[in-house]
Amino acid sequence: MEEFVRQCFNPMIVELAEKAMKEYGEDLKIETNKFAAICTHLEVCFMYSDFHFINEQGESIIVELDDPNALLKHRFEIIEGRDRTMAWTVVNSICNTTGAEKPKFLPDLYDYKENRFIEIGVTRREVHIYYLEKANKIKSEKTHIHIFSFTGEEMATKADYTLDEESRARIKTRLFTIRQEMASRGLWDSFVSPKEAKKQLKKDLKSQGQCAGSPTKVSRRTSPALRILEPMWMDSNPTATLRASFLKCPKK
């Protein structure tokens, strides 16, 4: 799984995921599924923000090519991917500037057009189940929730999907590709099943020549900074210049 992640995600995304896991004492060599899920969530957040700007008239526009003469502001502020201290500094600054209500939990993005924080979720389960879990945790109507699945489904607060259909389709296609690439390498089942994950971990440790006494238990602890995890796997926390370039997964 670790090799797959390093091949299939932008190096900047991988680096951010490594820093997040290191900050909370998590070993990516052991918790490889979490490593993959953090990278997936980061990429979705960056794709959500990509190409969306606000022009001089305050209108939301999509620009895929940089125009040095255009006075444009990024529509979305990316909060996900920052260390906790910096992330809260950004959130506080946004609240002071816009008058937005400070969220209880760190969100993933801020939408300057709709003036709201956004929580992004990526799940392999039924989207409505994960949405309800997320809403129950956040307990705030001020934070907009948008959930994507690896099967192409999505769910958002009040059916307001924020982005245009084409932008959302890019995200869904990327998630489907990740799923297919994992499956082709025999990694998908272990990514979504705790039992299969343990088997895969034991197999990986054995292939790495580690001793029989090496730890094989997969941690179920959820890092505070990586709250958008489902109960076992990561679903989901920099600047405007850190936009992901999306690499196709090379075949074996």
Curated annotation (Swiss-Prot):
Site note Important for efficient shutoff activity, residues: L28, L65, K202, K203, K206
Main localization (coarse): host cell
Single GO MF annotation: RNA binding
Record bears the keyword Mitochondrion: no
UniProt KW Zinc keyword: no
InterPro entries membership: PA/PA-X, PA/PA-X_sf
Site annotation Important for efficient shutoff activity and nuclear localization: residues: K195, K198, K199
GO biological process, one term: viral RNA genome replication
Keywords: Decay of host mRNAs by virus, Eukaryotic host gene expression shutoff by virus, Host cytoplasm, Host gene expression shutoff by virus, Host mRNA suppression by virus, Host nucleus, Host-virus interaction
Catalytic residue positions: E80, D108
Free-text comment about domains: The probable endonuclease active site in the N-terminus and the basic amino acid cluster in the C-terminus are important for the shutoff activity. The C-terminus acts as a nuclear localization signal. The C-terminus is recruited to host protein complexes involved in nuclear Pol II RNA processing.
Function: Plays a major role in the shutoff of the host protein expression by cleaving mRNAs probably via an endonuclease activity. This host shutoff allows the virus to escape from the host antiviral response. Hijacks host RNA splicing machinery to selectively target host RNAs containing introns for destruction. This may explain the preferential degradation of RNAs that have undergone co- or post-transcriptional processing.
Family from the record: Belongs to the influenza viruses PA-X family.
UniProt-recorded name of the protein: Protein PA-X
Originating species: Influenza A virus (strain A/Leningrad/134/1957 H2N2)
